[in-house]
């Protein structure tokens, strides 16, 4: 016996590590056997205690050293209710329940009369009791008829296949216990005409169905229809299919789960419990079809419980000859009084091994499909547009195709068409949106029918604050029809900047390609008729330069009207050299908006647009040079025009009118001469 201190230390180490993993413990286990002769002859020390265990000199010493052993189960005696388990080098001793004996062949606890090592009284093992599995051990059979047993440990699925051999009066015993794939060794003794109890033992909680079919003496197999022991078409619950058996099934969501009653109890489907066979209606008077063998008949005794086997019945077994077994068929068995609750598969043969196949009958891995499925939405080319009040940091690019646009408006908010002129637009609220619009080539035609009288000077009313807008128009034939139009312009390559009251990170850029603009002007201009600008034109100074135009101009006295309050607006009109006649085929005219403007106003030099190798380019350049030359020659007129920005009284306006009249009275011949000089000067420079 080991000292208690050693056992206490072993238990402390075991509890601290808690290593119960025994993966692979059923394969390639080392076989150990401690065989003790229990004859008791000559020892003088063998005594039996009240429990029937042997004490004295033949008691088995326990080897608890797991330092050199692999993880697994090991026998500690030839016939012992205890066994040793090794896990991570830690040894534990475990006891079999219910007076069972550990059988190292099947790695399970078994009745003593089924353990070859217990050919008598089981031995006593002095140790501290614990629970653990053990190893597999095989003891050679003596030269007597010994049942060939195959027992599988619980919780490892197996399928037992039995082979029929020639007819001999040698019973072969097969014990199947599912859920334990192990290698099973079969010991076969020479055939003798000795009747040996034939019994099948299944470890608790190991559902296995073994079918035995009695065949004729000529070994012809009998085919039976296999019962459909599945959950097809059955509601959730427990079913034994009307048979007297310790095996039943549980149905859950259409899945079949094999189950087994413990301790040789039978399943009562009506009460859904496991009970003694005598209390199960299916097992009474042969009403149930028990799946046992025809050669096993148990006579129920009327004595008090329990009987010698520990249950409420006694078993009497007789061996049958020449009965092959066919697995998987429902047997035809007639039970008298009581039928044992275990199916028996028997093979009558000499030297016939039993093969155990690692197969789990009716074991289904359960798969649960929940109603809630990951949702997949398939839309047929459906685009979703979400409108959000605040959409930060979104860049939108819009490309417009070629559009021929005609605009007619009575009162239109100003749109500016110019080359390289930025436009500023104020938006109430456009948060964090960058929009780029590319407009292709647009051909625009504007028709203007206008009668202008030089005597009438444009009248500016309203409040026009501090905005200077310069528009340069290349040589264009222009026709404009307007009643009251706030200026509409189309520009080539004009970026538009949008300023938003609350617009973080928003930039809107509009790129307009080259636009060929054709303007046809059919105009009879009378100086007295000048367009009057009314309304609210904020901060704009507009300077218009008109290239070569055929125009008839009647110059009369120019009237300048001063509005009570028109701050920071200067409109200047300069009339260049004019061929005066009833119809003048060739007129070079420069028109500059004349407006009253404070000294803060800045003059903006307009870019020149050149079209090489074109008549329009030459005429435009010629007109531009002509305007410059005429302005240089006519010092009085130019000075008066420049000084008109600072006129503040009626006398100054009258003086400006006289200067213009003097300029217009210049002779045609002198104007022609100056024009020729300007042409020559232009050709020299180009």
UniProtKB/Swiss-Prot annotation:
One Pfam annotation reads CBM_14
Q: Gene Ontology cellular component?
A: extracellular region
Is Manganese given among the entry's keywords?
Answer: no
Q: Where is this region: Disordered?
A: 284-312, 658-686
Which cysteines are cross-linked by disulfides?
Answer: 96-109, 261-274
Provide the coiled-coil residue spans. Answer: none
Identification of the protein by name: Chondroitin proteoglycan 1
Q: Which organism is it from?
A: Caenorhabditis briggsae
The organism's taxonomy opens as: Eukaryota, Metazoa, Ecdysozoa, Nematoda, Chromadorea
Chain's gene name:
cpg-1
